[in-house]
Amino acid sequence: MVKSIRAPAGEDERKDWLVRFDDSGRKISGVGTPPFEAPIYTQIFKARPDVQAIAHAHAPMCIVLSLADRTVAAVHMQSIPFEQSVPFYARPIHIKDDAEGADLARILGQGRAVIIKAHGLVTAGKSIDEACMTALYLEGDR
């Protein structure tokens, strides 16, 4: 798996800041350390062979929706992937271990998105573009 990280202060932000890690969260190569929430990625990839990319963001509007116990409504063409409601992961925690990651993957099911209560969103796709655009549409579909 590959995850981008923020460029350290004073470093060139145009440079690729990527860390590559295995399915147990151990660093293989790259810059920095694997994210402590690596189980988000490892457990979804394990549960969903069709998924090739995952996006995780601390999206403010999704956080607000989760705190209000409101789901996303399909109100425009870009919200078609959310025609069926986006599930919530009800525990407002960081996903730090395999059991939590597997529980998140179970709640995601065959869907393209899940909102972690008071935390953010996770989207899954067949490409980086699909996972990222799904996240952008989800955050913009208030």
Regions found by a protein language model. Give the residues of each.
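Glycine-rich flexible loops
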Residues: 1-142
